[in-house]
Amino acid sequence: INDFYSSITELHDEIRKQNRIGNQLIDLLMDNESPKLEFKASLWATYHGVSGKLVEEQEEKNLKLEDSVLKTVAGFLNTDGGTLLIGIKDKPRDSGDKVAEVLGIEPDFKWLKKGKRDPEGYTHVLFELFKNSLTNPVANQHINLDFPVYQGQIICRVDVQPLPRILGQQ
């Protein structure tokens, strides 16, 4: 009976944790972009501007998108930190949309190595990109990745803590 009660308690705690994570994500999706919150449709996959549909025939990574993600993370590191959600379509301020459109990161998986086309492989690639692109060697210690699922789509949540400032530095 004690084992049963213990497992029920653990399950209940996990459900509460998942609900809390889900509620935090919904709050972010309802916000507009700001100096501390950015949405990116993807790391590499291109979407048509007007229709918003995925460009299915794309063979090469869109490195402009990758660069945009890296610049956003660098900006967060060098200011007050922030959250980047990859797999979310930008929500124009005047669109009247209450919640940003969730696209998911799965279209980016096609450029990951076979057997690594999942959040773990995505994590590895992102941290390699950060390590190779960001000039501060401790930058990765200020970045946390999470992969919540919303409406059946995997999102990459990148939480960035600001780098410490040197005394007297603005």
Language-model segments: residues:
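Conserved N-terminal catalytic/coupling substructures associated with nucleotide/phosphate chemistry
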Residues: 1-170
